[in-house]
Every structure is written in structure tokens, then in C-alpha cells.
UniProtKB/Swiss-Prot annotation:
The gene is pkgD. This is Protein kinase 4. SUPFAM superfamilies: Protein kinase-like (PK-like). The keyword Nucleotide-binding applies. It comes from Dictyostelium discoideum (Social amoeba). It is an enzyme of class 2 (transferase). Residues 1-160, 233-296, 382-503, 520-556, 581-602 are annotated as: Disordered.
Length: 992
């Protein structure tokens, strides 16, 4: 500190001397050189990180330098910076290039910055001189020219650390000052080093303290976690102990109940023995009747006893006889239903029958029905493998409790019956290994040897029973001694029971292990079966493909009725095998756990045995259907339910061959005499709000037709009776090559049937969506055909009102057919009914003031636009009201790529004013035909259907089974009263 004070005093003295000699060079202050890192030293621009005081000084100097860029003073500081154009960018570049950052340290006396070391400062000075030499051409020469001082001062610039420090006006600065500066800088560097070292030590100490704190916190957290884990373990142990205690209490309660039961049985049997021994006759020791009766007495069953005794006493009935009779009736009905179900499933889907368990449930119902009938008849029941023994069964017949009064009579028939009791009890125990308590309850008059005999097998029971007979044939006096022995042996019986329970538990564990092994074996077998079945399934597919190819090659003019159905049934049953085996492999665990005793020993799939059976059973219903056709709504049962789309399609070749077969198409059919039973239903072609369309075949001629099936209840609920009647009326009147033909109509209790022409090419809508749009040529041909169809209808005073791509079908030749005449109507003047599709409806229909034939020409313009563009012009993602608003405005925007002639026709058809719309003018329909859009059209060739614009795509049809008895039918019927429903049916649908 003393040295620092001395240095400060020396510096102050030097400053005072310098101020006296050269007051104009106040910027070149030795004190400021040591105090600030950001100041300019002797014209150099070396900058370092400084404190707030040094930064303020550097800013002042920097501002003064900016203000004095153009002054020609004697000051060397300004001359150095004014030799070049010193703009802000050069400064920033220079500062960033020269800056030398060092770690911060504490200030010494608030004046000396600790960032400037001797070596570092020299590096900065060298950089500054180099940069000054590069940027300023020969700075030293300029300094010498501008100053009036000695040349020795310039030489000091190259040797001194401070650079051009002697460029000022004073001549009193010598080499001693430079040495003093070096000494002061060396002292400063020492202090900087010591301060930095102290700071580093302080930082290290702080880091160590923080690490220690973190370690302590981690240790505390670990200890808390360990304590929490220990508490949780203790809680778990307590819960386990509580559970064990509860189990022990339950076991004790069960043992007490068993002991109470044994005591009651012993008391009852003791009373019986006393009463029997008083009136004992040794003539009835080995009679089977008495043995059977004593079994019934000992077990609480009174089968084949005196009816007077049962009638006089009102015994507590376990199950009432009325309930039993009602259950019997229900089981008999259910068993019949299950029998029908099993027979049908055997013929149609045998694998579903095998895996569903329906057959097993049928057997269970039969067992239940037999038990109920036997209990009602009062017959004794024999235990079966699926039933527990009698001592645990709750008897279903009228039973009475055992009291002493029940045995006051029939004394002569109850003498020494212990032998028969032992025989029957041993047999019952062999039937069910889980129930061994009955052995001890019935051995009351036996010795200790007889108690041990109950634990043996059935082979030892006969020998033990013979010994019992010999003991019982001695005299009546031995009975009293045997009774006393029974009391002493009761504790032994309890011990034996406990041992037996332990043995039972061990046996159960062994059984479970065996069952698990069986499950694993079954899984392995099932995987093998599934692999075999996949191979067989592929073979069947190959065979079916070969069969279809052979059929297509060798097929003559006639097609058999059953070939397609047989192929489909074979594929269908194979597909059932494949899918169901996969389901079994995925669900083995659940099925095996639920069906341990009944289903473990059964194999789920035997392809070699059942392969030909399910094929024949699937074909059989089709032959039966052909010989004796079912009601029309039940014909869906003859078509197997399909799961795979690829394997359940009616081939396109079958459709094409049927259509092109001249013999089939040329056969005469009297449609007036046809019935519903003459037609066989196939695939679902389409569906609507209250109608479904299915492919059908006329059985005698094998010709394909289209059957439109309409639900009467839905029609009435939607109030479409008039439209349905109009559709029939219009179709019966029309006969045009561009309109679908209606051959006949049928009716039953629920449905209306329209027999129509089958159009195999599909809808025009599918072609537009598949290609995006249609070409100009195709659009011209189809628009011309539609014009001819509408011309025919308008000449018949019929308006169509539902022109859209969905109602335009493509026949096998590639021409248009109009279908779905639900909104068609025969009119003589304008009508005001509101109907149509929102995107195609005319504005005059929306107004409700009346519309006529011109509404169809509006729809024609919309249709031509959609065929060329791909979408209708008036479309909105919102509600229908938005579409209606666009239609009323009729601001149609045709894309520029559309042909100009087509654009002109669309703009003339889509006009809100009916009087200005093309087709409604004086020329009528001729104005449309004469439009340049149809300039290249030969209307006679179009009428004769000579040229088709495209080839139709006849695709295979998927099987979609229609359930005629659907829920919507019942829901629609609930909205209408039955009387009103029948009255409206008779009013509108009587002519069908």
C-alpha cells in the first residue's frame, strides 16, 4: 500500500509538471494511461474492458476525436486520426479487431484497471501500430511533418511502449518518464495477478461450499425416500397380515360350521340307532330296499317313502314345484330352438357351431330338463360326472327336515343299515374327489378301522363294508358300545378331515399343473392345425380359380344355376375356417380358463374329417332352395354371409356371359304371370332413403334383372306415397332406348318390388369421379342422348326434375340410361311441388310460384358444367340455404379452359329468367339442338345409338346382404297408428 501511495504521489507530480509545460496535451496524461483501458494512448486506439469511470473517459475522448476530424492542430492525437477518413464503421471494425478481453478483477484505488497487463498491453500496442500503418499511409511521416519538435521524440515512438506518446508540443518528456511508466505498469500487473489469484480461490471455495450443500441435500432426500419406502413396506406387511388373519378367521368359521354339521348329524344318527336297536330284527340285514331307504334318511332325501307322511307334513321346499314346471316349459322351448339352430349351423357354418359352444349349451339344457322332470316325478337322481354328489346337492323335489318324529313309524324296516350307508357313501365319494366330508358323517356305528376306510379307493370299500357287516350281525348289545366309541372318535375324525383337506389342495394344484400342460399342448396343436389349414385354403383357392377358368372355356349357351353359388359356398367355408382358427389362437387363454372341464379334451379343428362335410352342407341349402323356394324375404338365408371382399364377388365374366348369351336374352318371359318366388336375389347394387336395389335372376330363364325393393312403412312415414305411384305410372308409359324399362311390380306385407332392366355399367357419377372430368366429345354425345330422352318425356307431358350423374346409368354398350323416376310427374300445367337435388334444382322450383318443363333444361346446363369441370357450379360447405342463395343469384363462373361454345351453351341454359332460358323460347328444344355445341352431332345416329363415346367398365359385385326385417322398419311403424298405416297402404299400394 505504501508503494501504491508513493506511485500515486509521483504520478500526481508528473501530471502537475506536464500541465505546466504543455496544457494543450491534457489527453496524453500518464495517470489516465494507467487508470483507463479504453482511452487512446499517444494516438493509438487500443481498447480494453474498463470500469464505469474509464468508460466515461473513453467516451469523452472518442467524442472529441469525432468533433475534431478536420482540424489541423499541433496535437499529435488529432493528426493521427485525421490522416484518413475515420468513419464509424472503420472504428467499429478496428475496435472489434483490437479488443483484448481479460477476466475482470478488483480496481486499485478506483483508478487503476486490473485488465491491462504489461504483455497484453504490448500486444495491443503492436496491433494498433500495425493497423495504423495499414490504414494510414506512413503515420510517422505525417506526425513528423505536423510537429515542430525534435526528431528524437519520434524515435521514442518506436522504442517506447506507449507508441506515439511524444507527439505533443512539449520538449520536456524524456526517457526517464518512460522508465517510470514501465515500473508503474509492472507494479500494476503484480497487483492484478494477486487479485486474480484471490478471486479464483474465493470462487473455488464458493463452488466447494455449494457442492457440499448439494451433497447434503441429496443425502437428506435419499434418506427420506428410504424412510418412505420402509413405511410403505411396513404398510404392505400389515395389509398382508390383516388378509391372512381374515383368511384364518374364515377358515375357522368354516371349520366351526362343519363341526356343527357333524355334531347335528351324529346326534340324529344316535337317536336313530337307539330307536332302531330297541325294535331290532336280524332278518333284514342285507336287503337292498332298506339300504336305499336308509341312504335317503341319512342324507335328507325321502324318495319312494310313504306318501301319507309327506302329505301330512308341510316340509320346507327348496324349489317350488310351480317354478320347476315353468322352468321345464322354458327349457323345453329353448331346447327346441337350440336344436333348430344347431341343425341350421351344421349345414351353413359348421365351424361357427364348433367354436360358439351352441351344441354344448344344447346338451346342458337337456340335462337341466331331465333333472327337472325327474324331480317333479319324484325319481331318485343318480350323480353324474358334471354334478356334485348328493350330500352337497340341494334337492329339487319336496324334502323334509330330519326330526325324531319322522322315524317313529316303520321300525321293523330300519335295522342295521350301516353297511349300505358305507357302500353308497364310498361310491359317491369316488364320483367327485372334491367332496370327502360325507365319508366321516355316515360312519357312526363303525370302529376306528371303518373311519380309515373312507380315505381309500373304491376297491377297498367292499372289504371294509364286509367287516362292518360281521360286526353288526353279532347282537344288539354291541350297538351301545359302538355309540360310545363314536364320541371318542369324533376328534380323530376332525384330524382326518384336516388331512383330507390338505390332500385335496395338493391334488387341486396337481390338476392345475396338468391343465396348464394340456393348454400348452393344445396351443401347439392349434398352431399346427392353422398352418395346415392355410395350406389347404390356398389349395382350395387354386382349385376354384381353375374351376372358373374351365367353366369359362367349356361353358356352352346355358349356365347352370348352382355353379356360382357352390363356388362361393366353398370359398366362404374355407374363409370361416381361416378366420376362426386365428381367433382361437388369439383367445386360447380366456377360453381355456372358462372351460377347463368341458372343452379341454376337444380338438378345435379337424380338416381331414370335416373338409368334405362343410362343403356338402354349404351346397345343400342351395339345392333345397331351388327345389322348394322359400318366401322371398327369407331368401337371404341361402346366400352365405361373406367376410372377405375379394372372395365374395360375383365375377364380371358371369355377368357379361349372361348378358351376351342370346338364348338367355331371347327367351320369352310372361311377366304378368311371374311371381316373387320365380326370382333369386343376389347382390346389393345400391340403396336410398326408403329403397334398396338388388341384382336378381329369373330362375326358369336364368336372365338377370334389377329388383328395386321399397319399404312401405318408410314410404308412408316420409310421405312419399304419391311419388312412388307416379314413378310406377311414368315407367309403365315410357318405352325409350335411353330410359330404364320397368317389367313388372310385386307386393307383400312390407315391401313393394319393381322389376327393372339390369344396367351393368354403373353410374356416370363414378366415371366423372374416376377421371376428374369428361372430354368434350364424350360430353357432347351424352348431352345429346340426354336431350333426346328429355324430349321424349316432354312430348309425353312428363317432367323429370332429378337430372344428375347418379341417376344416369351406362349400359353394356356404353350408352346412357335414365333411372330413378321418383320425382317424375305427368303434368298439363305448371306445378308447385318442391322436389329435387339441391345442387341441380331450378330457381323457379325454389320460388314456389310454379314450374314446368324448363326446370329440366336448367339441370341440363348444370350437368354439362359438371361433366366438363368435374364438380357442379353451385356448391357450399354450409347448409342448403347457402346453395339455394347461389342458385337464386345464378352467378356462374365457367373456368377459362372450358371450350367457348360449351361456355355459351351453359350460360344460356343456367338463366334465372325462364322466358330467356334456352329451350323455353319460341323454337323450343330445336334451339338446343341447333346450338353450335351440337354442331358435329348427327341426331339420327344418336337416336339409333350407333356410336358409343366410351367403353363401360363392368366390375365384380360385392355381396351385401340386406336384412329385410331391419330395425328401421319397426321404428317407422311405431310413428304411425296401425289403422292409419293399413288404410294408407290400401289406398296407394292396392294396384301393385
Amino acid at each position: 500500500q505504501q508503494q501504491q501511495q508513493q506511485q500515486q504521489q509521483q504520478q500526481q507530480q508528473q501530471q502537475q509538471q506536464h500541465q505546466k509545460t504543455s496544457p494543450s496535451t491534457s489527453f496524453v496524461d500518464y495517470n489516465n494511461i494507467n487508470n483507463s483501458n479504453g482511452n487512446n494512448i499517444n494516438g493509438t486506439t487500443s481498447t480494453c474492458n474498463s470500469t464505469s469511470s474509464s468508460k466515461s473517459n473513453s467516451k469523452e475522448i472518442y467524442n472529441e476525436n469525432n468533433n475534431n476530424n478536420n482540424n489541423n492542430n499541433n496535437n499529435s492525437f488529432t493528426n493521427v486520426h485525421n490522416n484518413n477518413n475515420n468513419n464509424n464503421n472503420n472504428r467499429k471494425r478496428r475496435n472489434s479487431h483490437i479488443s483484448y478481453d481479460t477476466p475482470d478483477s478488483n480496481n486499485i484505488d478506483n483508478n487503476i484497471e486490473s485488465n491491462d497487463t504489461e504483455s497484453g498491453f504490448r500486444k495491443n500496442s503492436k496491433k494498433s501500430t500495425d493497423n495504423n500503418n495499414n490504414n494510414n499511409n506512413n503515420n510517422n511521416n505525417n506526425n513528423n511533418n505536423n510537429n515542430n519538435n525534435n526528431n528524437n521524440n519520434n524515435n521514442n515512438n518506436s522504442c517506447n511502449i506507449n507508441g506515439n506518446i511524444n507527439n505533443g508540443n512539449s520538449n520536456n518528456i524524456n526517457n526517464n518518464n518512460c522508465s517510470n511508466i514501465d515500473s508503474t505498469l509492472a507494479d500494476v500487473s503484480k497487483h492484478q495477478y494477486t487479485n486474480q489469484h484471490q478471486q479464483q480461490q474465493n470462487i473455488q471455495q464458493q463452488q466447494q461450499q455449494q457442492q457440499q450443500k448439494n451433497q447434503q441435500q441429496q443425502q437428506q432426500q435419499q434418506q427420506q425416500q428410504q424412510q418412505n419406502n420402509q413405511q410403505q413396506q411396513q404398510n404392505n406387511q400389515q395389509q398382508q397380515q390383516n388378509n391372512q388373519q381374515q383368511q384364518q378367521h374364515q377358515q375357522q368359521n368354516s371349520q366351526q360350521q362343519q363341526n356343527n354339521q357333524h355334531q347335528q348329524q351324529l346326534q340324529q344318527q344316535q337317536y336313530q340307532q337307539k330307536h332302531y336297536n330297541n325294535n331290532n330284527n336280524n332278518n333284514n340285514n342285507n336287503q337292498p330296499q332298506t339300504s336305499n331307504q336308509n341312504i335317503q334318511h341319512s342324507q335328507g332325501l325321502n324318495y319312494n317313502q310313504n306318501q301319507n307322511q309327506n302329505q301330512n307334513q308341510e316340509a320346507p321346499i327348496v324349489v317350488n314345484s310351480l317354478i320347476l314346471r315353468s322352468i321345464g316349459m322354458m327349457t323345453s322351448k329353448i331346447s327346441k330352438d337350440f336344436e333348430e339352430l344347431t341343425t341350421f349351423m351344421k349345414s351353413s357354418c359348421p365351424m361357427l357351431l364348433r367354436f360358439s359352444g351352441v351344441e354344448n349349451s344344447y346338451h346342458i339344457l337337456e340335462k337341466l330338463n331331465n333333472i327337472i322332470t325327474q324331480s317333479l316325478e319324484g325319481l331318485p337322481k343318480t350323480p353324474q360326472c358334471s354334478q356334485p354328489p348328493f350330500n352337497q346337492l340341494i334337492p329339487l323335489s319336496n324334502t323334509t327336515t330330519l326330526t325324531p318324529n319322522n322315524y317313529n313309524n316303520n321300525n321293523n324296516n330300519s335295522n342295521n343299515n350301516n353297511n349300505s350307508n358305507n357302500n353308497n357313501n364310498n361310491n359317491s365319494n369316488n364320483n367327485n374327489s372334491n367332496n370327502n366330508n360325507s365319508n366321516n358323517s355316515n360312519n357312526n356305528n363303525n370302529n376306528s378301522n371303518n373311519n380309515n376306510s373312507n380315505n381309500n379307493n373304491s376297491n377297498n370299500n367292499n372289504s371294509n363294508n364286509n367287516n362292518n357287516n360281521s360286526n353288526n350281525n353279532n347282537s344288539n348289545n354291541n350297538n351301545s358300545s359302538n355309540n360310545n366309541n363314536n364320541y371318542s372318535g369324533f376328534n380323530d375324525q376332525q384330524q382326518q378331515q384336516q388331512q383330507q383337506q390338505q390332500q385335496q389342495q395338493q391334488q387341486q394344484q396337481q390338476q392345475q399343473q396338468q391343465q396348464q400342460q394340456q393348454h400348452q399342448q393344445q396351443k401347439h396343436q392349434q398352431t399346427q392345425h392353422s398352418q395346415q389349414h392355410q395350406q389347404q385354403y390356398q389349395q382350395h383357392i387354386q382349385q376354384n380359380n381353375q374351376y372358373q377358368q374351365n367353366q369359362n372355356i367349356t361353358q356352352s349357351s346355358q349356365i347352370p344355376q348352382f355353379k356360382s353359388n357352390n363356388i362361393q359356398s366353398l370359398i366362404h367355408n374355407n374363409q370361416q375356417h381361416y378366420t376362426q382358427n386365428n381367433l382361437v389362437n388369439n383367445n386360447n387363454n380366456t377360453n381355456n380358463n372358462n372351460n377347463n372341464n368341458n372343452y379341454n379334451n376337444k380338438t378345435y379343428y379337424q380338416p381331414s374329417v370335416h373338409e368334405n362335410q362343410y362343403m356338402a352342407s354349404a351346397i345343400a341349402p342351395i339345392h333345397n332352395h331351388q327345389s322348394s323356394p322359400n318366401p322371398f324375404y327369407q331368401q337371404k338365408l341361402t346366400i352365405p354371409q361373406q367376410t372377405n371382399n375379394q372372395s365374395t364377388r360375383i365375377s364380371a365374366q358371369f355377368i357379361i356371359q349372361n348378358i351376351n348369351n342370346q338364348q338367355i336374352q331371347g327367351t320369352y318371359i310372361n311377366f304378368n304371370s311371374c311371381k316373387l318366388s320365380d326370382f333369386k336375389l343376389f347382390d346389393l347394387l345400391g340403396s336410398g332413403s326408403f329403397a334398396k336395389v338388388r341384382l336378381c335372376q329369373h330362375i326358369p330363364s336364368e336372365r338377370l334383372f334389377c329388383m328395386k325393393i321399397l319399404n312401405q312403412n318408410k314410404i308412408i312415414r316420409l310421405r312419399q306415397e304419391v311419388h312412388v305411384c307416379n314413378e310406377k305410372q311414368v315407367l309403365m308409359l315410357t318405352d325409350n332406348p335411353f330410359i330404364v324399362k320397368l317389367y313388372s311390380t310385386f307386393k307383400d306385407d312390407r315391401y313393394l318390388y319393381f322389376l327393372q332392366e339390369f344396367i351393368p355399367g354403373g353410374e356416370l357419377f363414378d366415371y366423372i369421379r374416376a377421371n376428374g372430368s369428361l372430354s368434350l366429345y364424350v360430353t357432347q354425345i351424352y348431352a345429346a342422348e340426354i336431350v333426346l330422352a328429355l324430349e321424349y318425356l316432354h312430348n309425353q307431358d312428363i317432367i323429370y326434375r332429378d337430372l344428375k350423374p347418379e341417376n344416369l346409368l351406362i349400359d353394356q354398350y356404353g350408352h346412357i340410361k335414365l333411372t330413378d323416376f321418383g320425382f317424375a310427374k305427368r303434368i298439363t300445367e305448371n306445378t308447385k311441388s318442391m322436389c329435387g337435388t339441391p345442387e341441380y334444382i331450378a330457381p323457379e322450383i325454389l320460388s314456389g310460384h310454379g314450374h314446368g318443363k324448363s326446370a329440366d333444361w336448367w339441370s341440363l346446363g348444370i350437368l354439362i358444367y359438371e361433366m366438363l369441370v368435374g364438380v357442379p357450379p353451385f356448391v357450399s360447405e354450409g347448409s342448403q340455404n347457402d346453395i339455394f342463395r347461389l342458385i337464386r343469384e345464378a352467378r356462374i363462373q365457367v373456368p377459362p379452359e372450358v371450350d367457348q361454345v360449351a361456355r355459351d351453351l351453359i350460360e344460356k341454359l343456367v338463366v334465372t329468367d325462364v322466358e330467356k332460358r334456352l329451350g323455353s323460347l319460341e323454337g323450343g328444344i330445336e334451339d338446343i339442338k341447333n346450338h353450335p355445341f351440337f354442331g358435329a352431332i348427327n341426331w339420327n345416329s344418336i337416336q339409333n345409338r350407333e356410336s358409343a363415346p366410351l367403353k363401360p367398365r363392368i366390375r365384380p359385385l360385392k355381396h351385401h346382404l340386406m336384412d329385410e326385417r331391419d330395425e328401421e322398419d319397426r321404428i317407422s311403424a311405431n310413428f304411425i297408428k296401425p289403422d292409419l298405416l293399413e288404410r294408407r297402404k290400401n289406398e296407394f299400394f292396392s294396384n301393385f
